[in-house]
Amino acid sequence: SGALMSRIIKLWLLLFFFVPAAALSYEFPPERSKSDAETEFGWMVLPLPIVVEGIGSGVPIAAAISNVYKSADLLMAKTFFEGDFEINLFSFSKFPLIGDKLLFSFGFTDLNMPFRSYDRGIDSGKDDYYQTLEKYDSNFVTFQSQFYKQRLEFLVSYSTGGTKLEKIFDVDGNDFSNIQSPQRRWIDRVIGTQIDLTDNHLDPNEGLRIGILHSESNYGLNELSDYAVNDLNVTAYFPFFETHTLLFNAFQSRSYITDNGIVDENALRNKYGLGCDLETETTACQNAETRRINYWLKRNQSSKATALGGLNRMRAYSLGRFYAANSSNYVLEYRLNYSEKRTPINWIFLGGIRTVLQTSFFYETGSVSDDIARLHEKMKSSFGVGFRAIISGLIYRFDLAKGEDGIAPTLFINYPLSLGTLGS
């Protein structure tokens, strides 16, 4: 299997360095285009049921309004019905401060819902996790500058957040509430740039797109390590027939510690223990406690690169499923645009100008490792089909992917394989 993986990696390298050069040499960069429908007013309002086994359920109502003011978009979500979770989300993005040269975004999130933390590394199993029920809040501001018909972009973002743990659940649904150090806060700083040498900023058919993102997380706590992450995202688009597109995507993420926290297990256990002596299920509590201590101990020792799994990459796996100090991901996706007719939509829950209906087929392979020399020794894969509609400049996406953990659906706004909010 090692020899086979070596051949696969060499094939990817050939594809990314030689095929794009040959295919794009005819007209590169391609002529830039933009549809008037991208600036039309549009909306979507839908309930999004959330069910987490062993913890509970909730039904937030999500609303997206595109081009509410010039290029600015509005995104909101809130739980109006009684349930086990609470979600309050507001985001106002791409407000033009100086024409289309300087865009401003801001938003806040206020949640009371569960988060799942898996064991570290590519070998973690689908049941190797603990879950936390948390009160979570965050705020962000972002400035984006775009030049040369959005071919060149710069981004600066600042966000603060905090969380308070109310309960911890093990994989069997046992819950423990005697949590030491339940609160933590952080500050994130992000800078990035993107070079977009494609024919269309919203829905590329040909060309090359390169994005770089640097982020720093500062916890302000002596017990937790601060760290930084560098991400590189490269996507090459090749036109097939009149409206189809074949894309290759390569993603690399590297992280490193900027300020050391506690790396002694006993000292960390004193800070993040669960008081298992006070629990009825003592053994189950101790297992969950050990899993939590190992999570933070290894994160303090080796930091955490951008994880694989969820909405953007390795779509067959849960959000944040695979993580370590380094991660990589490679994707082959074929997109069939079978309708590009400008079609007005005026439904109660969905409206705007539809310009594209699309079906996609994709294959992904990726890995994570604390040792960069072993990053590609063992890979996980994901494959599936997606359905997308572009309505008034927003991309509504439903993907269905299969991997070792089973089949997973994704319902989201925006294409996959993006790099933060670059290009959005």
Could you say what each language-model-derived stretch is?
Residues S1-R32, L422-S424:
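Cleavable N-terminal export/targeting peptides
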Residues A23-F106, L155, I179-N205, A305-R315, ...:
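Outer-membrane beta-barrel initiation region
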Residues E31, P114-D259:
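Transmembrane beta-strand segments of outer-membrane beta-barrel domains in Gram-negative
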Residues W43-V45, D73-A77, L102-F106, L152-V156, ...:
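Transmembrane beta-strands of outer-membrane beta-barrel proteins
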Residues V51-E53, I65-N67, T79-F85, P96, ...:
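Transmembrane beta-strands of outer-membrane beta-barrel pores
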Residues T79-Y148, D175, L247-A307, L400, ...:
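Outer-membrane beta-barrel translocator/channel fold
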Residues I191, F387-I391, I407-S424:
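Outer-membrane beta-barrel "beta-signal"
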Residues L202-G352, I413:
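C-terminal outer-membrane beta-barrel translocator/porin domains of Gram-negative envelope proteins
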